[in-house]
Amino acid sequence: ITGLSTRRRIEKGIGHIPEEYMIGVVPDFSVADNLVLDKYFEEPFAHRWGLDHKAVERFAREMIPQYNIRTPSKDTPAIHLSGGNLQKLILAREISHHPRLLIANLPTHGLDVGAAEFIQNQLLALKLEKCAILLISEDLDEIMSVSDRIAVLYEGRITGMVPAADAVKDRLGAWMAGVKL
């Protein structure tokens, strides 16, 4: 997938939540424009002369409350949002494509408890919709609550793999430190 353009990845049903939320947005663009960054070529947003701004506005009005994005306005530049609200914005944009695979790299890292819980609940809901989720996380509680199967990497190698139902924190921690059990 590394050789594919962003547009081709979307067309193939792949979504991505980056490790750093500022990488996932254009800081000076509005919340509304960031929600449709990857939809400019799709109906109803594509317009003969650019974006259909009314369609963008309708979409933003729907997504902002649905994903609990706390913003003064849809026109607020993304740079003025908290990390948790930026992450919810990115999640809303990525989920709106109904991906078959979502790569979530540290999706709750550095977020407050409320925002982290919201993100985890959205991932669980997405999982129920039969979306495969590749969760990359250092939070054992998050890993154990969201995952069906857990693989631990250490220095680029899998040191252990276990169904989440059989996972034990001590064993996972040992694998994370490179200990082979």
Describe each PLM feature range:
Residues 1-181:
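Glycine-rich phosphate-binding loops of nucleotide-dependent enzymes
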